[in-house]
């Protein structure tokens, strides 16, 4: 098999820097990470200094993602030799058991870590991930709520809890979690958009109005979000068609829906400039919007 350095004419420093970029930006290009990382470890370990250990960890996790347990185990053994008794390395052992679906073995490791260090957040999250993998959502929700009582500022945990509530069709609690996220990160368009989707799903005039407002705010924060644009259109259409809506409310929402329609068509026209099937794509969008047109009530 050809070396990465030969194929792409790169130095070991280039490969080391690329691994660092992938690590810091949370890339999940696992096969590339394994290929580049393996070559670095096998041929340039002595030049890497202490960086070699974080690369071992990075390659191990990527190898689990690719189903390469042989590489994962090799990396794990090196880390165990270098850091005997390390909670971080023990957690990697648990990750390997998870990849093998040996969940009870993984849980035993995580429980031992938490006995020594009850505040180990990464390990607590792994236990919750196992509950999800086993389809035990009620337990995952309970443990996440307990976790958030101690670590209320953990945005990742709030979002995970929102997703679990959505899966359980508990939209009111999902909306509460998303509101917490909006409060802590008011410039993230995705949270506004997801909150709007939850409110749209709940239905009813009041929820639809909230949905439209939050889709609008998502668009203000990211005017390229087609999902928010379609959401604005759909929520406006449903409000304008709602028999409980006032005449003014219906008139206003017809305007919002019309504006959203024009923006959607414009976006598809711009995106289609380099496409050979521009007219076909645009016609499909127009037909879809036509089927969703506002009907008098």
UniProtKB/Swiss-Prot annotation:
It is a peripheral membrane protein. Component of the ER membrane protein complex (EMC). Part of the endoplasmic reticulum membrane protein complex (EMC) that enables the energy-independent insertion into endoplasmic reticulum membranes of newly synthesized membrane proteins. Preferentially accommodates proteins with transmembrane domains that are weakly hydrophobic or contain destabilizing features such as charged and aromatic residues. Involved in the cotranslational insertion of multi-pass membrane proteins in which stop-transfer membrane-anchor sequences become ER membrane spanning helices. This is ER membrane protein complex subunit 2-B. GO terms for cellular component: cytoplasm; EMC complex; endoplasmic reticulum; endoplasmic reticulum membrane; extrinsic component of endoplasmic reticulum membrane. GO terms for biological process: protein insertion into ER membrane by stop-transfer membrane-anchor sequence; tail-anchored membrane protein insertion into ER membrane. It is found in: Endoplasmic reticulum membrane. InterPro entries: EMC2-like (IPR039856), TPR-like_helical_dom_sf (IPR011990), TPR_EMC2 (IPR055217), TPR_rpt (IPR019734). PANTHER family: TETRATRICOPEPTIDE REPEAT PROTEIN. Belongs to the EMC2 family. It comes from the Eukaryota. Its main location: endoplasmic reticulum. TPR repeats lie at residues 87-120, 155-188, 192-225. Keywords: Endoplasmic reticulum, Membrane, Repeat, TPR repeat. It holds the Pfam family TPR_EMC2.
